[in-house]
Curated annotation (Swiss-Prot):
Coiled coil: none annotated. The keyword Nucleotidyltransferase does not apply. This is Probable succinate-semialdehyde dehydrogenase [NADP(+)]. The gene is gabD. Signal peptide: none annotated.
Amino acid sequence: MAIATINPATGQTVQTFIAHSQVEVNAKLDLAQETFQSFRHLPFAQRGQWLRKAADILEQRRDEWAALMTLEMGKSIPQAIAEVNKCALVCRFYADKAEEYLADEVVTTDASQSFIAYQPLGVILAVMPWNFPFWQVFRFAAPALMAGNVGLLKHASNVPQCALAIAEIFQTAGFPEGAFQTLLIGGKVASELMADDRIQAGTLTGSEPAGASFASAAAGQIKKTVLELGGSDPFIVLEDADLDQALKVAVPARMQNNGQSCIAAKRFIVQASVAEEFFQRLTKAFQALKVGDPSLSTTDIGPLATPDILADIVAQVEQTIAAGAHCRCGGQALDQPGNYYPPTLLTDVPPNAPTYRQEFFGPVALGFTVDNLEEAIALANDIPFGLGASAWTTNPENQQKLIRGIEAGAVFINGMTKSDPRIPFGGIKRSGFGRELGRMGILEFVNAKTVWIA
């Protein structure tokens, strides 16, 4: 099977790779299993030294890695550079914190001595998406490796050069070859690998169907999985909100990564008394964004990653408008080479629209008007997803009602939903289960062993 790198800005094939054969995959699995037997016993200081070196390599060759991301999936250069910086940050964070997070935890019981010992699981299969091709991998790999596990990466098929580059970074930093390897294989093969006895656990970031298939394969073998799937995050604006600040944040909250982010704000739920002003100003802000060549530092919105993603967005917008939604800006693909779609705002979306509860994975925002806080919370929860949420209000009582009432893995008050190495990240409902980042993120990849000495 051939795996091609296609530039989404031009549609031109850049490079083609041959997928790994079954023999090659087996060899990588054997090497991973063999490496784990010694890697798990290395001191935290050694693994931390290598991880800090990986951070150095990320920063020293930042422009190279950023250009690679832009070439393969269309992310704008400034955002790609920011992604590389964030990867270096998460490496240093876990290099510093892993030993503290995984220290034996003393528990007072009737025993003369009792504690929890945290030990690595083994070989972990990571299936990762194209939208944040470096960040999604490093936020898994940094804690997993520091805990003493070894990783196998199956990356999205449209970012093979990013996948190979990440393995190169870890090996150049000093990690044994078998500690982190890249598999160039199809998604179906990745799910089938969960049945292999050499793999102890798996993690997947991607679509809901991909997550369901992966979890099903893991369940048949009773193997642990961490899933971070889709999201359709609400961005709630109440009448007492600081509109200037909310609007300033609303644009990157929706349009980061060309709108292709699971944790992006996708549904803007605004109280009626300020709704028209908010939507008019948001429309102008969207129209001011520059759509174009992602390799230029002046570009705000680059192309969507693939023609299929563009086709999905075109169909969703057409269906939403046909159902009665008001298109305030955008609404049609650009007539030029590449997978370009302009920033689009659709308001007055009726509940009977076939796209009402769908995730829009592109530069499209939906706008809703509500009368009060209770309606805002109900509308925010009226979807099958529960990844993140943003809410804007200066009233402390309303803030607490929003925090407790919204069904999501994270709620940001007067701020933009984001993933930060210091705090756990993950969702509920069909957005997945398990947590990444923070202490909870590293605990996903260890066995919490109870020790009781009578």
